[in-house]
């Protein structure tokens, strides 16, 4: 289906990107936001999640608290990955690849060094929807932005190469809110492909779903909601797992990062939170 502007209406997994934009718009409207995303409101509005919906849903208290927990996790992971990207380009990396880019607007809202090339990899529908909103907003990227319309289940490395990615140069890879929707074998395959395209000095930022979080949210999730589509759980030893793939990794819990950013989680600590849901990694082998 299309909307009045002729845009394909969000559906399936990529529709969750509009929900993420809604949360980022809410954060941007705060007095002291952890980041500013001026395009988030436009994406949310175009996807039917505009100003009238920029508040927590009125549901039962348990559902409302879960929603707030997810929303805060989106804010924290966004800040975490912004910082990771800033460190990567400060170290000299000039290639950025956003896997499952969705409504990510970092090409437009962050400051990038001259020569930075940012590749947005996603299927054609969300990229087309996004392009329509960007035209409407007359948005201008702050770096060289290259869209790569391809399904991650297909030959995305080939499409990325055709778009100009140079595997001989370091790259910073971002998989934000993506891996939780993929089965374990698909996650393994994706990261093996990423490794094959990563020169020494490359960086990677991942968000992972811990077993407890997936089970706790998916159990009573509404049909079609983001949580109802979560399938992937973080390995028991993510650092060891990534070491086997050629990456030196650090993991961080959302709770620890939230406290560090001055936004402490108000929910009680869960025994099943695991070692971390946020990952920063550096390429050690190729």
From Swiss-Prot:
Which Pfam families does the UniProt entry name for this protein?
Answer: LCM (PF04072)
One example of the protein's molecular function in GO is: methyltransferase activity
User: Which major enzyme category is it?
Assistant: transferase
What residues bind S-adenosyl-L-methionine, as annotated?
122, 151-152
List GO BP terms, alphabetically.
methylation
Q: Which Gene3D superfamilies match?
A: Vaccinia Virus protein VP39
Task: Tell me which InterPro entries the record gives.
Answer: Ppm1/Ppm2/Tcmp, SAM-dependent_MTases_sf, SAM_mthyl_Trfase_ML2640-like
> Could you confirm whether the keyword Ligase appears in this record?
no
SUPFAM superfamilies with a match to the protein in the record: S-adenosyl-L-methionine-dependent methyltransferases (SSF53335)
What UniProt keywords apply to this chain's record, in alphabetical order? Methyltransferase, S-adenosyl-L-methionine, Transferase
Look up the EC number in the record and give it. Answer: 2.1.1.-
Concerning its family, UniProt says: Belongs to the UPF0677 family.
- Purpose of the protein: Exhibits S-adenosyl-L-methionine-dependent methyltransferase activity.
Instruction: Kindly provide the name given to this protein in its UniProt entry.
Output: Putative S-adenosyl-L-methionine-dependent methyltransferase FRAAL3718
Q: Which organism was this protein described from? A: Frankia alni (strain DSM 45986 / CECT 9034 / ACN14a)
């Amino acid at each position: 289906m299309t909307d009045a502007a002729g845009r394909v209406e969000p559906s399936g997994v990529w529709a969750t990107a509009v929900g993420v934009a809604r949360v980022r718009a809410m954060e941007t409207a705060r007095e002291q936001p952890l980041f500013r995303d001026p395009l988030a409101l436009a994406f949310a509005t175009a996807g039917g999640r505009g100003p009238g919906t920029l508040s927590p849903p009125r549901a039962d208290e348990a559902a409302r608290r879960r929603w707030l927990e997810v929303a805060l996790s989106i804010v924290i992971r966004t800040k975490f990955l912004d910082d990771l990207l800033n460190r990567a380009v400060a170290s000299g990396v000039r290639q950025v690849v956003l896997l499952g880019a969705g409504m990510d607007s970092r090409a437009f809202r962050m400051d990038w060094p001259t020569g930075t090339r940012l590749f947005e990899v996603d299927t054609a529908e969300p990229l087309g929807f996004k392009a329509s909103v960007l035209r409407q907003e007359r948005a201008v990227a702050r770096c060289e932005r290259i869209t790569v319309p391809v399904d991650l289940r297909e030959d995305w490395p080939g499409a990325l190469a055709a778009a100009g990615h140079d595997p001989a140069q370091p790259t910073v890879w971002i998989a934000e809110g993506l891996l939780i929707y993929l089965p374990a074998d698909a996650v393994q395959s994706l990261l093996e492909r990423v490794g094959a395209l990563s020169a020494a000095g490359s960086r990677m930022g991942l968000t992972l779903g811990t077993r407890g979080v997936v089970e706790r949210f998916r159990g009573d999730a509404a049909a079609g909601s983001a949580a109802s589509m979560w399938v992937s759980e973080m390995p028991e030893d993510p650092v060891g797992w990534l070491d086997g793939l050629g990456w030196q990794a650090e993991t961080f819990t959302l709770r620890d990062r939230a406290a560090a950013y001055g936004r402490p989680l108000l929910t009680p600590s869960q025994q099943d939170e695991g070692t971390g849901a946020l990952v920063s990694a550096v390429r050690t082998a190729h």
